[in-house]
Amino acid sequence: MLVLVVNCGSSSIKYQVREVTPEGSEPSPYTSSMPAINENIPLATATAGMAGDQVITKGLIENIGTSEIQDHTQALEILARRLDEELGGRTIDAAGHRVVHGGERFSAPVLVNNEIIRAIERLAPLAPLHNPAHALGLRAIQKTYPGMPQVCVFDTAFHRTMPEKAWRYAIPEQWYEMDGMRRYGFHGTSHDYVTGKACEFLGIPREQFNTVVAHLGNGASVTAIREGRSYDTSMGYTPLAGLVMGTRSGDLDPSVVTAMLERKPGMSAQDMNRILNNESGLQGICGDSDMRAVEQRADSGDERAQLALDMAAYRLAKYIGGYHVAVGGAQALIFTAGIGENSPGFRALVCDQLGALGVRLDASRNEHPEGNVARISFPDSAVEVLVVATDEERAIAEATAALVWERVKN
């Protein structure tokens, strides 16, 4: 089965076409008559028995709305022509979409119909920069590929298993009831995917696996995984909460926001949102948001860069310690995503602070991890330390194929 994986932004479409084959079965072309939608199949269950590691083609369409490409429909038409040429007449069987916010409704991947698209649009206040664009992409594919099944995979869905004590904020009840103010969590597809890969590597049944996953990119989050499910996570109502990130502040005393708004009469809520999301984090501390550049500066003796690294590592180490308690003793610590997979220096800076947990990092293995899943701790480390390559597009492709294939079989 050929699956088009799309990530629609407000002015861009990032895409991959992947070959996904249900084990023991031949791929099947899609049908335009799909049975009922199921919103309760977990991603880990949906993708069982799927192999989606072959990328046929990938690319990016940019400047939608600010160039000759007027809207997402036109962008998808251009993409369809491009894919016709690149695929040599092969047919796209289904499309899988990354959707940032599924709110409280969506706890698993879903097959798309018009009501699902409207539900995603209604969640726009929770992700105003993302969900409207996702809906545009869904409708554009409906027009470009009539009848082709589409599946949405939600960044927030994996975290729907958190207990209420973890996702509730200690704020007035009506703020939650009326305005949806609660912890949602993000990067769920990645956290879910690497947890599964770690289980396979360690030979531990998922329902018996307790771990802490650190997804470290320019945006970063850490998740407590208890019995294979999300139990707590650092991001909150928005992706601003939690760790020190490239340009995001992470956790902050709310009084800082109110005090600055009072002291700066001309500052708006929009200004504050921009500053905390785009001008803070590593950028705010040392003037650079790129971890590689910050590490290079620190190595050359730059004190501000070293402070930025120390703050980011300390914040993460504190979360890991707390989540070790939350899961009842982590069997593994997993590093993933751009920084997590590619920065041995930052991994060491974090793990050096975890001696109280019995973590013992093997410096040689940490410098040169091998394979998509690598153990970088000593054999006598009380907590296994792993580097696991994430692949959110593969997870989306496999979830898409699983739902479509199940409906075709039934």
Swiss-Prot record:
Biological role: Catalyzes the formation of acetyl phosphate from acetate and ATP. Can also catalyze the reverse reaction.
Species in which this protein is naturally found: Kocuria rhizophila (strain ATCC 9341 / DSM 348 / NBRC 103217 / DC2201)
Metabolic or biological pathway: Metabolic intermediate biosynthesis; acetyl-CoA biosynthesis; acetyl-CoA from acetate: step 1/2
One example of a Gene Ontology biological process annotation: acetyl-CoA biosynthetic process
Molecular functions per Gene Ontology: acetate kinase activity; ATP binding; magnesium ion binding
Reaction it catalyzes: acetate + ATP = acetyl phosphate + ADP
Cofactor: Mg(2+); Mn(2+)
This protein's UniProt keywords: ATP-binding, Cytoplasm, Kinase, Magnesium, Metal-binding, Nucleotide-binding, Transferase
Active-site residues (renumbered): D155 (proton donor/acceptor)
InterPro entries the UniProt entry points to: Ac/propionate_kinase, Aliphatic_acid_kin_short-chain, Aliphatic_acid_kinase_CS, ATPase_NBD
Highest rank taxon of the organism: Bacteria
Record-listed Mg(2+) binding positions: N7, E392
Residues bound to substrate: R98
Site (Transition state stabilizer): H187, R248
Protein name: Acetate kinase
UniProt-listed Enzyme Commission number(s): 2.7.2.1
Residues involved in ATP binding: K14, H215, L216, G217, N218, G219, D290, M291, R292, G338, I339, G340, E341, N342
